[in-house]
């Protein structure tokens, strides 16, 4: 739990707040750009890259020797999440016919909501029984599974743009 993390990494409250803030900033700030990257370079490719970066960030978090390294690794995770997030909705919109798209988006939304509720509960259990590092190690098998399933089931869709224009 948080006191264990603070004790093991000799971190104060401000540093531990940055563990979450670094992740959130790294997710939100590049979102518009990362969505466009999917349009230009391909949604499946950007999804897999994002999941991979997220996974590498999770491993870096789990082995972080200092709170500063943990904060940086959380930012890496956030960049990975930012790369994958816009691709999911884009792929759903492109591969499902109009009459099935609403159901597909609904299932996607429900899965995301259940994960948002179950994640902290499962994380609390893991951290309570195995230490704060378990909250990061648990991502690794899901990262591998997500990449394998995306490569097997998500089609390589044609890109819709040829360049990224800067404003």
State the predicted function of each range:
Residues 1-152:
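Transmembrane-helix bundle of Major Facilitator Superfamily
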Residues 148-166:
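Helix-loop junctions on the cytosolic side of multi-pass membrane transporters
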